[in-house]
């Protein structure tokens, strides 16, 4: 395509890469601790298994305990466990899930828009090294999405995301080079077409 001198090329747009604000980053770094307003709180804290207990609540079936598989569950015990994970805990957990969904969608949209812009330019060849750069960014974003999943599954964990700004800057620099080449070709084409028009208009 680069050797095609009869048609112009579209410039490449580099969309903004998804990032989390400081407040969201702090939430990821902060262990989500269950409430102390339950007689079971100290026991769970000593065991260090709040995440395990929280996940087990989803498997409660009538009186059968999901932890020991015995018929040991009654309403008082179930309320005591539920009280460990109070409204504040549930709201923070919902915040984490919202962060994951928004970040995951933004990552997918970023890669999709970038690839579309490269294809739409009509200039970038399949073997251009920019595709490898995009793959690296995609891999780092995928690792971040997995880290956010881990935070949801283990709210007591403290996590931080990989800084992909270096990869982003490399892609940005590459796109500037490609756009410079595209502009040069388009300028030459426009100059050629202008010359042809001037010549033919005088005939």
Task: State what each model feature region is.
Residues 1-62, 69-203:
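"flanking P-loop NTPase cores in genome-maintenance ATPases
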